[in-house]
Amino acid sequence: FDMSEYQEQHTTARLLGAPPGYLGHDEGGQLTEAVRRRPYSVVLFDEIEKAHPDIQNILLQILEDGQLTDAMGRKADFRNTIVLLTSNLGARFLAGQSAPLGFAAGSEAVFEKQSAQAIEEAKKWFRPELVGRLDELIVFRPLAEDSLCAIAEKLLGQLEARAARNGYQLTHTPRVGAVLAARARSPYGARELRRQVDRAVE
C-alpha cells in the first residue's frame, strides 16, 4: 500500500471498508479483503510517514491482536502475514555521504552511528506503543554506484522496449547508464534516476 494515498483521515476507511450506508459498503476494505483472500502474504505499507496518524491505530490492532475487523464485521486474520513498514524517516542522517557508503574502509562505524540516529528519528515519529510492537527497525545503506548503474540499464531497456512497440529503435552504450547513475546520486534511492532517464533520454 502506497501510504501517500492515505494522507487524509477519510481515506483510512478504505483499508477497512466503508461503514454501513455509505457507497462501497458491500465491497469490504482494501487491506482486510486482500488479507482475507491471501492470508499468507507480505503486507507492505510504503512510506508510512506520509499516512494519516489514524493508520497507526490500525497497525496497533494488527500487531497486538493479529486481526482486523472490517466495516461489515468480518475478521481478517494477520497471524500468518509479514507486515513491513518502509520510511524515509532519518534518511537525512545518511545524506551527503559519498558513494558507496559502507564499502570503503573504516566507514562501518560511521554507518552504525548514522543508523542509530535514523532509528531515533523514526522512534520519535511513531507512537511508543507501536514501536514496542515492532520486531526490528532496519536501516538500509544508500545504493552503491554499481546498483544504480544496473537500475539505469534496466530503465533504459524498458524505454527501448516501449520505443520498439511504437516503431522506433533505440540503443545505448553502457556509458549512458553510468552517466545517468552519477547524475542521480540521492540518499532517497532510485527515484532521481527515473527522473534523469525521463529528462535526459525521453
Briefly describe each language-model feature range.
Residues 1-202:
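AAA+ P-loop NTPase nucleotide-binding core of proteostasis motors
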